[in-house]
C-alpha cells in the first residue's frame, strides 16, 4: 500500500481548528517571528523530525512544518530551551518503553512561553512559562500548538536552563527521595551514576535536607575534577566503582550510617554492590540501566537483610497522578524553592542551535559526558 506523502498529511492535519490530538501534538509544531508582534502572520515552524528508528544523529532531520490554528482549548507556545536526555536517545533508537507514531518530533522535556491562548483556556495566559506534563509532546522545535491541559506553569524568576531541565531528572530525584523511605537529616543514600542529571539532582536535594550521599562514579581521566564538582554540589562522599568493592568501605561507614536507600541507574554488578551496603530493611530503587545488564539480587540480601527491590519511572508517576494537579504542583513548587535558594542548579549545559543537531546528538552519545546538550530557540 502506498503511504501518503508528509506534505499531504500536513495539509489534512492542519485543516482542523479543534483540539490537537495526541498524534498531531507529536508530529507538528509552530514558530513565531523574532519580534513576536504578530502571531497571525506566522505560517510554519522548524522542528527536528524522525521517520524511522536508528542512530540518533542519522535518523533526525531539520524540517519546516506548517502551523495549525489555535483551537479553543489549545495554546500556541514558543519553545525557549529543550535538552537531550538519555530517554530521548532511546526513543530515537526505538528501544524506549513508549514510542510515538512516526513521523515524530524528538524531545520530551523543555520550557516554552505561551504566546496565544484559545477561547476556552482558563488555566494559562500569554507570557506564562510552561513545561509538558507528560512525555511524547516533541520539544525539539521552535514552537507548537498544544492542549492547555497538557502543560503546567513554572515561575519566570528561575533560570531558563533550570526550567528546561526540571521536568525529568529533578522530578525523578525528588520522588525517589520521597516515596520509598522516610528519610530524615543524618540518614544516608547511596547511588551510582552520580554524575548523571538524576544523580546531580539527588546530591543537591539530599544536601538541602541534611541527608548524606555516597556517590559512585566510573573511573575516568577527569576523575578529580568531577569529584570536586560533585562535592561542591553537596556530595558527602564520591567514590569509584572499584572503591565500592574494597574493604575500605568499612572506614567510610564510620563517618555516616549505612544507607537506607540505594538508587540504581546502571544495573549489573554496580547494582549488586549497592545492595551489599544497604542497611537491613533498606530499599534499592532502579530508575535506569546504562550498563544494559540485569539487576542480580543475592538471596542473602533478601533473607537476612529483608531488602526491598523497586523500580521507578517518572513518566508513569505523572500518568498515575494525571488528575492530581496538586501533587505535581507541590513537587514543582518545592523544587523551584530550592532553585531560588541556590540549592538546586541545572547540570552543566552546552547550548546549541537546532541546526547544529547532529553534533549535539553525537556529543550526547559519547561516554564520560558530564555536560548536557540543550537546544535553545
Curated annotation (Swiss-Prot):
A cellular component term, taken from the record's GO annotations: mitochondrion
Main subcellular localisation: mitochondrion
Record field: catalytic activity: a 2,3-saturated acyl-[ACP] + NADP(+) = a (2E)-enoyl-[ACP] + NADPH + H(+)
Presequence boundaries: 1-52
Keyword Oxidoreductase annotated: yes
Residue ranges crossing the lipid bilayer per the database entry: none
SMART domains: PKS_ER
GO terms (BP aspect): fatty acid biosynthetic process; fatty acid metabolic process
Binding site for NADP(+): 169, 195-198, 218-220, 287-290, 312-314, 372
Keywords from the UniProt entry: Fatty acid biosynthesis, Fatty acid metabolism, Lipid biosynthesis, Lipid metabolism, Mitochondrion, NADP, Oxidoreductase, Transit peptide
Pfam families, A to Z: ADH_N, ADH_zinc_N
Residues annotated as catalytic: 96 (proton donor)
Purpose: Catalyzes the NADPH-dependent reduction of trans-2-enoyl thioesters in mitochondrial fatty acid synthesis (fatty acid synthesis type II). Fatty acid chain elongation in mitochondria uses acyl carrier protein (ACP) as an acyl group carrier, but the enzyme accepts both ACP and CoA thioesters as substrates in vitro. May provide the octanoyl chain used for lipoic acid biosynthesis, regulating protein lipoylation and mitochondrial respiratory activity. Involved in iron homeostasis; affecting Fe-S cluster assembly and ceramide metabolism.
Protein name per the record: Enoyl-[acyl-carrier-protein] reductase, mitochondrial
GN (gene name): mecr
Amino acid at each position: 500500500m502506498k503511504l501518503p506523502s508528509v506534505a499531504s498529511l500536513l495539509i489534512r492535519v492542519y485543516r482542523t481548528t479543534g483540539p490537537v490530538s495526541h498524534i498531531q501534538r507529536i508530529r507538528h509544531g509552530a514558530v513565531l517571528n523574532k519580534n513576536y508582534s504578530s502571531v497571525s502572520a506566522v505560517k510554519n515552524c522548524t522542528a527536528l523530525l524522525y521517520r524511522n528508528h536508528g542512530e540518533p544523529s542519522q535518523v533526525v532531520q531539520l524540517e519546516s512544518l506548517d502551523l495549525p490554528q489555535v483551537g479553543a482549548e489549545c495554546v500556541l507556545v514558543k519553545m525557549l530551551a529543550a535538552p537531550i536526555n538519555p530517554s530521548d536517545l532511546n526513543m530515537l533508537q526505538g528501544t524506549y518503553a513508549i514510542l510515538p507514531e512516526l513521523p515524530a518530533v524528538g524531545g520530551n522535556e523543555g520550557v516554552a512561553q505561551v504566546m496565544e491562548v484559545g477561547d476556552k483556556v482558563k488555566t494559562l495566559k500569554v507570557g506564562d512559562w510552561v513545561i509538558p506534563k507528560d512525555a511524547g509532546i516533541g520539544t525539539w522545535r521552535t514552537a507548537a500548538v498544544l492542549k492547555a491541559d497538557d502543560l503546567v506553569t513554572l515561575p519566570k524568576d528561575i533560570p531558563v536552563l533550570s526550567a528546561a531541565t526540571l521536568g525529568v531528572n529533578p522530578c525523578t530525584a525528588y520522588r525517589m527521595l520521597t516515596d520509598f523511605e522516610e528519610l530524615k537529616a543524618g540518614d544516608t543514600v547511596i547511588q551510582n551514576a552520580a554524575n548523571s542529571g538524576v544523580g546531580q539532582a539527588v546530591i543537591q536535594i539530599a544536601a538541602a535536607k541534611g541527608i548524606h550521599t555516597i556517590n559512585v562514579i566510573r573511573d575516568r581521566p577527569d576523575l578529580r575534577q568531577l569529584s570536586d564538582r560533585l562535592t561542591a554540589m553537596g556530595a558527602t562522599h564520591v567514590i569509584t566503582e572499584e572503591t565500592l568493592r574494597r574493604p575500605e568501605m568499612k572506614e567510610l561507614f564510620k563517618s555516616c550510617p549505612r544507607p537506607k536507600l540505594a538508587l540504581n541507574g546502571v544495573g549489573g554488578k554496580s547494582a549488586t554492590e549497592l545492595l551489599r551496603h544497604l542497611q537491613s530493611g533498606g530499599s534499592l530503587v532502579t530508575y535506569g540501566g546504562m550498563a544494559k545488564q540485569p539487576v542480580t539480587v543475592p538471596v542473602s540480601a533478601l533473607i537476612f537483610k529483608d531488602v526491598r527491590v523497586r523500580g521507578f519511572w517518572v513518566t508513569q508517576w505523572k500518568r498515575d497522578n494525571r488528575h492530581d494537579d496538586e501533587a505535581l504542583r507541590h513537587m514543582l513548587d518545592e523544587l523551584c524553592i530550592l532553585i531560588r535558594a541556590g540549592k538546586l542548579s541545572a547540570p552543566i549545559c552546552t547550548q546549541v542551535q537546532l541546526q547544529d543537531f547532529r553534533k549535539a546528538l553525537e556529543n550526547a552519545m559519547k561516554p564520560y559526558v558530564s555536560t548536557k546538550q540543550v537546544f535553545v530557540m
